């Protein structure tokens, strides 16, 4: 599917859909619990649906009722799946799911789409082995497909958490292991996502110790109680509208955003404000209006998902914008550092690729044919670039937006953007 975009203004009110990260965590916690849970206002997208199917395959009973999921959990004792588990494009689901499967007896096999089969799992597989279960890559390359055989027992492991999902997977599942677990963290990127996982553990009354994110102790033999939660809006999805407002001079009011939530991407609003945009928090809404932007040096380690959109913002900021300390952006759905540099250069951007980020200088962009590489955040970021570039921009693999934000095109169109899809 192609996404066609022409230079146009967009403004208005947008209700941001539920957080993908919270939705997937809620589904796993509810599945691991014993009893019935309700998840209100979840994100309905390809990634979230992948999590639903994985939890079902492991024994959870999940029904969609109006705007909520009702989950009957398996009490920390997952079933042996009837077939190979396919996580689609969801890296979070894969990394959480393989350790959940290791809580039970028997073998499970996990795979995913082409992008998933290229994303690393090695450190998490080693941790699973260190904690008493078995896990290995069928191609012996630390990537899916992987085979997992339970049961986890507990003990001590190190983890090189180049992606926070490795550590989060251990934190989510280890309370249900019979013995205590000690985790030595040799590297940790994306700390806010770990904070989100810890927020859930606190909410559910789990006993653990966090020693400055270097060492974690998790008491074994615990249980998750059923939960009744409402999923907050997704700051990662809000980022695209925030950047559109900031670079165009228009105004958006973005509803369903809770600034007290642990999501790291809420930092985007303070970054854009520091660059010159006008930002006002109004309860559970954020009002953002564009103004002349000035380039900044930004440490992106905590917010790697914002790199594609902030690369676009840098094209419209005076001077130079540096997006630094985010090497993990290279192991997302695509190598987002390389892909954004490559595609924005096609539009005329003055942009330089670094090992751990990008340097962008103010540029006049021109529409052209672009490759989205099937990466939802790349496609949506290039769409924002296209709305502010001369002429027409055509982006391929537009269907990728369904991974996290199926209504992205409709929302922008309703706000006045000249944007549409076609085969």
Curated annotation (Swiss-Prot):
Q: Does the keyword Cytoplasm apply?
A: yes
An individual GO BP term? aromatic amino acid family biosynthetic process
Its pathway, per UniProt, is: Metabolic intermediate biosynthesis; chorismate biosynthesis; chorismate from D-erythrose 4-phosphate and phosphoenolpyruvate: step 6/7
Catalytic activities: 3-phosphoshikimate + phosphoenolpyruvate = 5-O-(1-carboxyvinyl)-3-phosphoshikimate + phosphate
Instruction: Name the catalytic site residues.
Output: 305 (proton acceptor)
Keywords linked to the UniProt accession: Amino-acid biosynthesis, Aromatic amino acid biosynthesis, Cytoplasm, Transferase
GO CC, alphabetical: cytoplasm
Q: What is its EC number?
A: 2.5.1.19
The cellular location(s) given in this protein's UniProt record come to: Cytoplasm
Q: Which Pfam family is an annotated match for this chain, by its short name?
A: EPSP_synthase
Q: What class of enzyme is it?
A: transferase
Keyword Transferase attached: yes
Binding residue positions for 3-phosphoshikimate: 20-21, 25, 163-165, 305, 328, 332
The entry's phosphoenolpyruvate-binding residues are 20, 91, 119, 165, 336, 377
Any single GO molecular-function term of the entry would be: 3-phosphoshikimate 1-carboxyvinyltransferase activity
What is this protein's function per UniProt? Catalyzes the transfer of the enolpyruvyl moiety of phosphoenolpyruvate (PEP) to the 5-hydroxyl of shikimate-3-phosphate (S3P) to produce enolpyruvyl shikimate-3-phosphate and inorganic phosphate.
Q: How does it assemble?
A: Monomer.
What family name appears in the similarity comment? Answer: Belongs to the EPSP synthase family.
Task: Please state what the protein is called.
Answer: 3-phosphoshikimate 1-carboxyvinyltransferase
Which organism is this protein's natural source?
Answer: Acetivibrio thermocellus (strain ATCC 27405 / DSM 1237 / JCM 9322 / NBRC 103400 / NCIMB 10682 / NRRL B-4536 / VPI 7372)
């Amino acid at each position: 599917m192609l996404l066609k975009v022409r230079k146009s203004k967009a403004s208005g009110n947008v209700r941001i859909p539920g957080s993908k990260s919270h939705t997937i965590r809620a589904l796993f916690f509810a599945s691991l619990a014993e009893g019935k849970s309700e998840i209100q206002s979840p994100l309905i997208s390809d990634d979230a649906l992948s999590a639903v199917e994985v939890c079902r395959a492991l024994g959870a009973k999940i029904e969609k009722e109006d705007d909520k999921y009702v989950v009957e959990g398996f009490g920390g004792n997952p079933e042996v799946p009837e077939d190979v588990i396919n996580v689609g494009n969801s890296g979070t689901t894969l990394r959480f799911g393989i350790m959940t499967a290791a809580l039970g007896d028997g073998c499970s096999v996990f795979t995913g789409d082409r992008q998933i089969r290229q994303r690393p799992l090695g450190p998490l597989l080693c941790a699973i082995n260190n904690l008493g279960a078995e896990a290995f890559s069928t191609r012996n390359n630390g990537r899916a497909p992987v085979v997992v055989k339970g049961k986890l027992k507990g003990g001590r492991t190190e983890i090189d958490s180049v992606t926070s999902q490795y550590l989060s997977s251990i934190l989510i599942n280890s309370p249900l292991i019979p013995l205590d677990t000690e985790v030595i963290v040799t590297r940790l990127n994306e700390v806010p996502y770990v904070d989100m996982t810890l927020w859930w553990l606190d909410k559910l009354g789990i006993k653990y110790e966090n020693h400055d994110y270097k060492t974690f102790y998790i008491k074994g033999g615990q249980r998750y109680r059923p939960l009744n939660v409402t999923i907050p809006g997704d700051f990662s999805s809000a980022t695209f509208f925030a950047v559109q407002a900031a670079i165009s001079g228009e105004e958006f009011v973005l509803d369903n955003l809770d600034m007290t939530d642990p999501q790291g991407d809420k930092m985007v609003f303070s970054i854009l404000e520091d660059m010159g945009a006008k930002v006002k928090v109004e309860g559970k809404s954020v009002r953002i209006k564009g103004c002349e932007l000035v380039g900044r040096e930004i440490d992106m380690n905590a917010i790697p998902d914002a790199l594609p959109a902030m690369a676009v913002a840098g094209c419209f900021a005076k001077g130079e914008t540096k997006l630094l300390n985010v090497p993990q952006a290279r192991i997302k759905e695509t190598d987002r550092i390389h892909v954004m540099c490559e595609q924005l250069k096609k539009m005329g951007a003055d942009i330089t690729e670094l090992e751990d980020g990008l340097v962008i200088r103010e540029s006049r962009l021109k529409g052209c044919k672009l490759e989205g590489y099937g990466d939802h955040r790349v496609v949506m970021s290039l769409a924002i670039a296209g709305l502010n570039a001369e002429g027409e921009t055509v982006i391929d693999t537009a269907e990728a937006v369904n991974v996290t934000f199926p209504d992205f095109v409709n929302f922008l169109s309703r706000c006045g953007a000249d944007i549409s899809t076609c085969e």
